[in-house]
């Protein structure tokens, strides 16, 4: 793992975008994208730039079960608002959280991943070490699947909803094995709340108790963190 220390999330977004541009110059065509507050500074850099993404494909990590693209809390809505409406891509894929058969939709999404191999995967990390919505206990070879969200994840995401009861309890997520198929990983984390997870990911054993620790077995991982997130290393 390559660890890059930055002063703040704004600098982290700039650094991540530099790595994406470098990858695109070297032929990258597919970006794996994430949602939440962590990648927002990256998407600001992307939308403010003159870089053309119309030949790029994106594959998103996850989506809440029960929310469609018109729902403001859905991850499809988030991606459209923060990136795709401002910077068109050739194709954009987000899991279908409203599918009648979620298992079939998950298997179909895995086929999409295999048909569009991810060149650069953007990741955040949960306070419990989750990547995507792969909670502790998820098999490290897991593929796209339906996830029961933990109480800590629901509480971490309640700030996006009017009340905690409105937070979906399930999601469709790329599995850890799905994520590991990507050629290059860029994981960003900011703030003291992420320090324990960063320590476990980098210094701890590879274990299902810390899903992000699987990245120790990947050949090309860049970790972009501020001093607070790095404080327990």
Curated annotation (Swiss-Prot):
One of its GO terms (biological process) is carbohydrate metabolic process. Its EC number is 3.5.99.6. Pathway: Amino-sugar metabolism; N-acetylneuraminate degradation; D-fructose 6-phosphate from N-acetylneuraminate: step 5/5. Keywords: Carbohydrate metabolism, Hydrolase. The keyword Hydrolase applies. It comes from the Bacteria. It catalyses: alpha-D-glucosamine 6-phosphate + H2O = beta-D-fructose 6-phosphate + NH4(+). SUPFAM superfamilies: NagB/RpiA/CoA transferase-like (SSF100950). It holds the Pfam family Glucosamine_iso. The active site is at 62 (proton acceptor), 128 (for ring-opening step), 130 (proton acceptor), 135 (for ring-opening step). GO terms for cellular component: cytoplasm. InterPro entries: Glc/Gal-6P_isomerase, Glucosamine6P_isomerase, Glucosamine6P_isomerase_CS, NagB/RpiA_transferase-like. GO terms for molecular function: glucosamine-6-phosphate deaminase activity; identical protein binding. HAMAP family: GlcN6P_deamin (MF_01241). Catalyzes the reversible isomerization-deamination of glucosamine 6-phosphate (GlcN6P) to form fructose 6-phosphate (Fru6P) and ammonium ion. Belongs to the glucosamine/galactosamine-6-phosphate isomerase family. NagB subfamily. This is Glucosamine-6-phosphate deaminase. It comes from Enterococcus faecalis (strain ATCC 700802 / V583). The lineage of its organism: Bacteria, Bacillati, Bacillota, Bacilli, Lactobacillales. The gene is nagB.
